[in-house]
């Protein structure tokens, strides 16, 4: 099986199982260790993912001292903040710690609100406002409107009726003010061209219709149809302003030029119309010398159309009754009265304060709500005063800045108001002298406003707020701070007095505080207050806390801090960076870093030091410790994961070194302890999984059972633990992963041993209780063991060992890295070898259990007398049934292994049967039957093409059976065939050589014995009287063929026989290629009574056919040796056979002669 495919299959199987709820089997399996691995693996990872989602929710706010009761809280029942749905109408009590402003008496107003001035009090200001009401400008003056405004002012100023009547009459008798019309000529567009070049040289003339002789002219803008002037004019109005009309004319300036100068302009002429204009100008100049300006167009503006707040509008230019467009002019118009500037500004400041105080009291406006919109009457009075006082937009804005910042100290106003005022004030203030009165007024307002701005930064976690209100207020505050910090603070102004900003860290140093440092200090101060709040609120009594409770406290603390950071990143980071280029969450993290490191380190080290060392079982697994009372929960590891994620967050936010980055050494003892527990619990879980295993395939697509899946699930959870651990230090990482690898290998070995023991006791017999029936359980057990073994490398690869080794080489040396890699590789290989041996051992057990019936059937089937026995059929049925079970259940590799085991056991059986039946002097027919049975088995299961050691052994057994099944003469012949092969392998012989020629003919054999060489001397005189005797083997084939011999040649070691023999042979005799001719050379004694054996040689009919006719054949002479020959051993077992006995006796005599 491809290991990668196997791992993928298992992975998808696990994913499928995880999608379903735990089964009864899983409950039983996890009950023993309370789901130890699931807690540390998948469940803890899922919990981490859930926690990540929870962190994205709003954070429970920090409770303020003086916050309202439950009815003022924006919290939901689950403690999270709910966003306001009606942000425009909801009170924004976000950062208020002060009570709402109470109504004030007249005395309070005059003393705490109005500025001190030698000529200004409430009655004076009241009289001035009444006077402006009676003499308003820019709107219709009717009695009903006047009465409404008078009543409003009396209420706002809190003037008694008696005093009011007196002041009322005095205001009516005053002379009306001198009114002026303030005009700004801004620009014109698309003017009609009046010059020959297609352009004009425009300027503006303006005058009142009642006084046409008093005209005001702007500058000339040469050669343009879209001039920009931006010039101001102030026209006194002597008649009734409502009846006046302002005339605005745009003229084309015609400079005084000579005819020659005009002619020179001919190159600038544009079009036929331009040429015509130039010719006309030349003619006029030449005839009269006049240089008249030409009117482009005019506009008439009635002053009664101008509102009190002024007007900026485009007017179309006209001339006569012609409808042709002559362009348009942008003009700004405003009416004002003549008044002392300083007095007017002072009046306006006090008026704004009085109007705002009255607005806040009557409308019951909440803190941070009012954003600058007065009631209609109040707005009319304010704008009328500004108009009649001739105040510029800057004067009004600076007065508002002063008045509103003063009120803001006692009743908080919306920051949008101040932000909009700064847009008007800052561009002007930037260019003023630092010692000017306006600059002082501005910075006084800044000093009054800044404390509330920094309060916003400090109270971002306030209880009485929704996230929308926080963001809205923060945007405005940061805009305000950004605009203020761009200004240069005068040396005489201290905007951060210690009496107000006691929380600034610069108070304890010589550093100069500025807006930027104050912002960071405000953030840190608020963060410190928040941290102190959650630290005190989360911790139980230190004296009664257990280790687990201490860790839960750390988890809760980090989660709340992380939640605060999450909200900072989600809601505030973009705002801070966009507004003031500050990384808000990085500032928070750096503050939290040192504080959390101090808190967490002491707790974690204390908890880890309380851990007791465990007694881990050795590789013999003789006992498994009881861990019922020694069970570290997931809490410590959960703390590690939370800290790891927290540090990763910090590294992404901050470039500075972090104290918490070195948190992992605190957990070394805890991780070691967990790994010790994990191996013990893994072994116990594996044992229980095997006990619960029914040894049935988990489904139809696989061939392994539940215990294999359960074991790999343990590995999977351990892998998840390691990936979650992600130990950063390379040496420690190697130590831990090496232990994990070793533990996984030990688990695999333990599984193989326990699974083997489980199935060894399973014995299913047939109906007669004689034969072992190979059940599916045995096959599943083998598959389980092999599946675990094949899965091990894949799991170990998932631990990223190669990456750790690579990092180790970079940290240390490549040599050390290679040594470490070799160590891990050896551990894995040893485990795989041990598992393989365990599988082979189990396969051998199966084969040994199948051996008795196989032996019995083989023995019964080989009996000569049991010809009608069906033992052979029974044997084949037994094997087919067993092999069918194996084939259907085992995978291909294990099926091949068990086949090898069966045939290996079969070789042992055959050896035993052969040996035992040889001892019993069984006839050759017995061995013939046995051989036939073996051959049938091999043919049936197609074993002939397999090249394994066991098949070679069976082939050897088959050869022995064929040998033992031969008759005695055939055995003797077999022995001589062996001698022939031995003869051919000899290069020389001490007994000499024999030379012949031989040829098979149609009728027989033509044999010519030629000579012999170097015969071994047999006589004392060193000579020999030799002759050659030729016989045919096997004797059973050549009974009718006589033996031939040569004449005796005396006293010669090189006899020349040269004798020819014609021997008749049948066709059958000639066709047998393995037939032999045995040549025996003997020495005849002196008296011719007996002959002494010298040596012999052999040649087969096959060799004769292969030799060309007439070619001499030289054969080495040899003496037969009584060696360890299979043929001789077979003959030795036939002691009751006379032919065998005589042959062996003869052979021994020749061998030792």
Curated annotation (Swiss-Prot):
<feature type="binding site">
    <location>
        <position position="254"/>
    </location>
    <ligand>
        <name>Ca(2+) 1</name>
    </ligand>
</feature>
<keyword id="KW-0966">Cell projection</keyword>
<dbReference type="InterPro" id="IPR014770">
    <property type="entry name" value="Munc13_1"/>
</dbReference>
<dbReference type="GO" id="GO:0007269">
    <property type="term" value="P:neurotransmitter secretion"/>
</dbReference>
<dbReference type="GO" id="GO:0046872">
    <property type="term" value="F:metal ion binding"/>
</dbReference>
<comment type="function">
    <text>Essential for tracheal development in embryos. Functions with the GTPase Rab39 and downstream of dnd, to regulate lumen fusion between previously separate tracheal branches (anastomosis). Essential component of secretory lysosome-related organelles (SLs) that are present in the tracheal fusion tip cells (FCs).</text>
</comment>
<keyword id="KW-0967">Endosome</keyword>
<dbReference type="InterPro" id="IPR014772">
    <property type="entry name" value="Munc13_dom-2"/>
</dbReference>
<keyword id="KW-0106">Calcium</keyword>
<dbReference type="GO" id="GO:0005856">
    <property type="term" value="C:cytoskeleton"/>
</dbReference>
<dbReference type="GO" id="GO:0099503">
    <property type="term" value="C:secretory vesicle"/>
</dbReference>
<feature type="binding site">
    <location>
        <position position="1019"/>
    </location>
    <ligand>
        <name>Ca(2+) 2</name>
    </ligand>
</feature>
<keyword id="KW-0268">Exocytosis</keyword>
<dbReference type="Pfam" id="PF00168">
    <property type="entry name" value="C2"/>
</dbReference>
<feature type="binding site">
    <location>
        <position position="1025"/>
    </location>
    <ligand>
        <name>Ca(2+) 2</name>
    </ligand>
</feature>
<dbReference type="InterPro" id="IPR000008">
    <property type="entry name" value="C2_dom"/>
</dbReference>
<comment type="subunit">
    <text>Interacts with Cam.</text>
</comment>
<feature type="binding site">
    <location>
        <position position="1083"/>
    </location>
    <ligand>
        <name>Ca(2+) 2</name>
    </ligand>
</feature>
<dbReference type="GO" id="GO:0005764">
    <property type="term" value="C:lysosome"/>
</dbReference>
<keyword id="KW-0677">Repeat</keyword>
<keyword id="KW-0206">Cytoskeleton</keyword>
<feature type="binding site">
    <location>
        <position position="253"/>
    </location>
    <ligand>
        <name>Ca(2+) 1</name>
    </ligand>
</feature>
<keyword id="KW-0458">Lysosome</keyword>
<feature type="binding site">
    <location>
        <position position="195"/>
    </location>
    <ligand>
        <name>Ca(2+) 1</name>
    </ligand>
</feature>
<dbReference type="GO" id="GO:0035147">
    <property type="term" value="P:branch fusion, open tracheal system"/>
</dbReference>
<feature type="binding site">
    <location>
        <position position="201"/>
    </location>
    <ligand>
        <name>Ca(2+) 1</name>
    </ligand>
</feature>
<keyword id="KW-0479">Metal-binding</keyword>
<dbReference type="InterPro" id="IPR052095">
    <property type="entry name" value="UNC-13_domain"/>
</dbReference>
<keyword id="KW-0963">Cytoplasm</keyword>
<protein>
    <recommendedName>
        <fullName>Protein unc-13 homolog 4B</fullName>
    </recommendedName>
</protein>
<dbReference type="GO" id="GO:0030175">
    <property type="term" value="C:filopodium"/>
</dbReference>
<feature type="binding site">
    <location>
        <position position="252"/>
    </location>
    <ligand>
        <name>Ca(2+) 1</name>
    </ligand>
</feature>
<feature type="domain" description="C2 2">
    <location>
        <begin position="990"/>
        <end position="1114"/>
    </location>
</feature>
<feature type="domain" description="MHD1">
    <location>
        <begin position="637"/>
        <end position="755"/>
    </location>
</feature>
<feature type="domain" description="C2 1">
    <location>
        <begin position="162"/>
        <end position="288"/>
    </location>
</feature>
<comment type="similarity">
    <text>Belongs to the unc-13 family.</text>
</comment>
<feature type="region of interest" description="Disordered">
    <location>
        <begin position="54"/>
        <end position="84"/>
    </location>
</feature>
<dbReference type="GO" id="GO:0016082">
    <property type="term" value="P:synaptic vesicle priming"/>
</dbReference>
<feature type="domain" description="MHD2">
    <location>
        <begin position="869"/>
        <end position="975"/>
    </location>
</feature>
<dbReference type="GO" id="GO:0008021">
    <property type="term" value="C:synaptic vesicle"/>
</dbReference>
<dbReference type="GO" id="GO:0005770">
    <property type="term" value="C:late endosome"/>
</dbReference>
<dbReference type="InterPro" id="IPR035892">
    <property type="entry name" value="C2_domain_sf"/>
</dbReference>
């Amino acid at each position: 099986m491809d290991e990668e495919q196997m791992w993928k299959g298992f992975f998808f199987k696990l994913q499928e199982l995880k999608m379903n709820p735990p089964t009864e089997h899983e409950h039983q399996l996890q009950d023993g260790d309370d789901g130890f691995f699931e807690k540390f693996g998948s469940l803890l990872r899922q919990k981490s993912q859930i926690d990540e989602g929870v962190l994205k929710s709003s954070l429970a706010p920090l409770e303020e001292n003086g916050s309202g009761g439950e009815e003022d809280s924006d919290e939901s029942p689950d403690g999270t903040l709910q966003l306001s749905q009606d942000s425009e109408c909801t009170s924004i009590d976000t950062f208020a710690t002060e009570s709402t402003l109470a109504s004030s008496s007249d005395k309070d107003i005059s003393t705490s609100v109005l500025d001190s001035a030698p000529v200004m009090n409430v009655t004076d200001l009241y009289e001035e406002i009444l006077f402006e009401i009676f003499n308003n400008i820019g709107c219709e003056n009717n009695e009903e409107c006047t009465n409404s405004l008078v009543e409003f002012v009396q209420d706002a100023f809190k003037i008694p009726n008696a005093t009011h009547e007196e002041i009322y009459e005095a205001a009516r008798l005053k002379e009306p003010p001198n009114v002026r019309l303030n005009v700004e000529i801004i620009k014109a567009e698309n003017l009609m061209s009046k010059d020959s070049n297609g352009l004009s040289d425009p300027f503006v003339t303006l005058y009142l219709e009642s006084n046409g002789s008093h005209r005001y002219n702007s500058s000339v803008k040469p050669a343009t149809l879209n001039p920009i002037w931006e010039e101001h004019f102030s026209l006194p109005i002597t008649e009734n302003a409502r009846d006046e009309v302002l005339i605005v004319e745009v003229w084309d300036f015609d400079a005084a030029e000579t005819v020659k100068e005009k002619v020179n302009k001919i190159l600038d002429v544009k079009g036929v119309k331009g040429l015509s204009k130039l010719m006309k100008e030349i003619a006029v100049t030449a005839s009269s010398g006049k240089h008249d300006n030409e009117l482009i167009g005019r506009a008439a503006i009635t002053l009664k159309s101008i509102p009190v707040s002024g007007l900026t509008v485009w007017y179309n230019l006209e001339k006569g009754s012609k409808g042709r467009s002559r362009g348009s002019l942008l003009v700004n118009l405003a009416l004002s009265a003549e008044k002392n500037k300083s007095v007017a500004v002072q009046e306006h400041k006090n008026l704004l304060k009085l109007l705002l105080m009255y607005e806040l009291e009557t409308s019951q406006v909440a803190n941070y709500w009012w954003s600058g919109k007065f009631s209609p009457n109040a707005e009319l009075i304010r704008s009328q005063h500004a108009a009649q006082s001739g105040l510029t937009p800057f004067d009004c804005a600076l007065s508002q800045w002063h008045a509103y910042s003063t009120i803001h100290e006692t009743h908080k106003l919306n920051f949008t108001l101040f932000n909009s005022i700064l847009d008007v004030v800052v561009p002007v203030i930037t260019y003023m002298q630092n010692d000017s009165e306006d600059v002082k007024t501005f910075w006084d307002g800044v000093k009054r406003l800044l404390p509330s701005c920094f309060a916003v930064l400090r109270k971002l976690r306030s209880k009485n707020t929704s996230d929308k209100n926080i963001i809205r207020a923060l945007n405005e505050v940061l805009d305000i701070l950004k605009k203020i910090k761009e200004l240069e603070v005068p040396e005489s102004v201290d905007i951060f007095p210690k009496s107000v900003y006691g929380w600034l860290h610069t108070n304890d140093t010589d550093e100069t505080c500025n807006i930027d440092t104050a912002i960071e200090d405000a953030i840190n101060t608020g963060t410190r207050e928040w941290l102190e709040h959650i630290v005190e609120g989360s911790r139980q009594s230190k004296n009664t806390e257990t280790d687990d409770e201490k860790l839960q406290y750390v988890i809760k603390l980090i989660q709340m801090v992380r939640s605060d950071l999450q909200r900072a990143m989600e809601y505030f980071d973009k705002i801070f960076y966009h507004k003031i280029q500050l990384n808000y969450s990085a500032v928070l993290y750096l503050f939290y870093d040192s504080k959390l490191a101090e808190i967490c380190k002491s707790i974690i080290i204390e908890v880890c030091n309380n851990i007791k060392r465990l007694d881990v079982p050795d590789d013999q697994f003789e006992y498994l410790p009881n861990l019922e009372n020694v069970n570290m929960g997931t809490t410590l590891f959960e703390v590690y994961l939370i800290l790891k994620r927290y540090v990763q967050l910090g590294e992404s936010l901050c470039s500075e070194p972090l104290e918490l980055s070195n948190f992992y050494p605190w957990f070394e003892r805890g991780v070691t302890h967990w790994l010790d527990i994990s191996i013990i619990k893994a072994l116990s879980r594996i044992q229980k999984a095997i006990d619960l295993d029914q040894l049935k395939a988990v489904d139809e697509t696989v061939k392994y059972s539940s215990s294999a899946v359960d074991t790999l699930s343990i590995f999977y959870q351990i892998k998840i633990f390691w990936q979650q651990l992600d130990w950063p230090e390379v040496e420690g990482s190697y130590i831990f992963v090496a232990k994990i690898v070793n533990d996984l290998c030990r688990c695999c070995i333990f599984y193989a041993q326990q699974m083997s023991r489980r199935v060894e006791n399973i014995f299913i017999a047939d109906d007669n209780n004689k034969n072992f029936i190979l059940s599916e359980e045995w096959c599943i057990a083998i598959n389980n063991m092999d599946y675990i073994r094949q899965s091990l490398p894949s799991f170990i690869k998932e631990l990223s060992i190669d990456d750790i080794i690579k990092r180790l080489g970079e940290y240390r040396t490549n040599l050390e890295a290679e040594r470490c890699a070799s160590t891990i590789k050896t551990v894995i290989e040893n485990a795989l070898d041990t598992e393989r041996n365990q599988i082979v051992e189990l396969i051998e057990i199966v084969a040994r259990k199948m051996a008795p019936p196989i032996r019995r059937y083989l023995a019964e089937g080989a009996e000569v007398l049991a010809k009608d026995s069906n033992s052979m059929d029974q044997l084949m049925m037994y094997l087919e049934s067993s092999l069918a079970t194996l084939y259907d259940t085992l995978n291909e590799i294990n099926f091949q292994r068990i086949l090898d085991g069966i045939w290996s056991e079969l070789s042992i059986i055959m050896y035993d049967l052969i040996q035992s039946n040889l001892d019993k002097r069984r006839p050759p027919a017995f061995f013939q039957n046995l051989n036939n049975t073996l051959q049938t088995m091999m043919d049936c299961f197609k074993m002939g093409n397999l090249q394994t050691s066991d098949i070679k052994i069976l082939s050897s057994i088959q050869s022995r059976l064929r040998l033992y099944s031969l008759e005695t003469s055939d055995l003797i012949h077999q022995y001589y065939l062996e001698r022939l092969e031995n003869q051919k392998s000899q290069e020389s012989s001490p007994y000499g050589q024999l030379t012949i020629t031989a040829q098979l003919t149609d009728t027989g054999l033509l044999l010519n014995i030629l000579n012999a060489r170097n015969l071994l001397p047999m006589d004392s005189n060193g000579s020999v009287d030799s002759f050659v005797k030729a016989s045919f083997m096997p004797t059973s084939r050549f009974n009718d063929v006589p033996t031939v011999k040569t004449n005796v040649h005396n006293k010669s070691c090189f006899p020349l026989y040269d004798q020819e023999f014609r021997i008749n042979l049948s066709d059958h005799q000639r066709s047998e290629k393995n037939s032999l001719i045995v040549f025996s050379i003997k020495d005849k004694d002196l008296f011719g009574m007996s002959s002494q054996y010298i040596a012999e040689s052999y040649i087969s009919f096959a060799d004769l056919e292969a030799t060309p006719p007439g070619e001499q054949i030289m054969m080495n002479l040899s003496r037969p040796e009584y060696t360890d020959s299979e043929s001789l051993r077979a003959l030795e077992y036939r002691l009751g056979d006379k032919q065998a006995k005589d042959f062996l006796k003869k052979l021994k005599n020749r061998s030792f002669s």
